[in-house]
Amino acid sequence: MNFVKNKLVVVGAGMVGSAVLNSVLSLNLLSEVVIIDINDNKAKGEALDASHTTSFAYSPNVKVRAGNYEDCADAQIIVITAGPSLKPDDKLDRLVLADTNVKVTDSIMKNICKYTKDAIIIVVTNPVDIATYYCQNNFDYPKNKIIGTGTLLDTARMRKIIGKKYNVDSKNVHGYVLGEHGGSSFTSWSDVNIAGIPFNQLNDIFKDHYKVDKDEVDKEVRDSGIEVLKLKGYTSAGIAMSVSRLVKAMLLNEQSILPVSSTLEGEYGINDVALSIPCIITSNGIEKKLEIPLSKDEVEKLNKSADNLKSIIKGLNTNK
């Protein structure tokens, strides 16, 4: 397959798709961006609006347009954002979207597969772990080329929370949130550190600042997305930046280690469910899944997260 160099397709022109479109353009790495939506006028409007930004200084002359699934044929990266999102008055659990959005994802994947099985697909649609599992296991598409955003945003939230409490730049906070992008996610505290200082020493070293409580941080991370949803009606900026981070790692073949969702195949003794663990991201997608050292309690939490997701997968109603 001959790709158009640095061509990206966004499927879905809703709040998230629009934010993703503008976020990836700001990378200044793309030659062409196509947006697809069931509402063609919405896609055209988003593309036209975004295209006007390319006239500003230091913006490359990117081709931005609305298109259709044929545009996937020579795309390097495809981002799936389509599907209903949680509303503030919904039951505030991403898993309630499972049946509906798996059907949406099924339709999208069937259309993509008509034209390519070479592009890297980034799955954003919630519940992202369920959607990622479905995409990886039902279309004979290379699994390493399908990546769910997973707990990448949760990890950014955790780092921001800890950085703020200790009054340090959150980019100097290291560690991961693992498992489900949702209620059973957890921070791998055994790996969290600031400048190499392990978490269990941080309260002593930063004794003039807030004493960080693990359970409090985990709850704040899990509640962050819901809090944004309640306040503004939807989430968009954080997840769009998460997508941009992945796109940059792929286009530049960075070999970056990021916590993303993929079907586990024996890692930590877990099989046949997609959830987030650290993965090496390259121009091929997921190059390698890493079993970082976890405490016994953290492995138990990962298994609990897996069991939670498996129960949803088992109960899916995928009648088309």
UniProtKB/Swiss-Prot annotation:
Binding site for substrate: R94, N126, P127, V128, D129, D154, T155, A156, R157, T235
GO MF entries: L-lactate dehydrogenase activity
Keywords, comma-separated and alphabetical: Allosteric enzyme, Cytoplasm, NAD, Oxidoreductase
UniProt-annotated catalytic positions: H181 (proton acceptor)
Chief place where the protein resides: cytoplasm
Entry keyword Cytoplasm: yes
Domain of life: Bacteria
GO biological process: glycolytic process; lactate metabolic process
Residues noted as binding beta-D-fructose 1,6-bisphosphate in the record, renumbered to the chain: R159, H174
Pathway: Fermentation; pyruvate fermentation to lactate; (S)-lactate from pyruvate: step 1/1
Keyword Transport: no
Record localization: Cytoplasm
Regulation: Allosterically activated by fructose 1,6-bisphosphate (FBP).
Subunit-level organization: Homotetramer.
Family statement drawn from the similarity comment of this UniProt entry: Belongs to the LDH/MDH superfamily. LDH family.
Entries under NCBIfam families matching the protein: L-LDH-NAD
Protein name: L-lactate dehydrogenase 2
Gene: ldh2
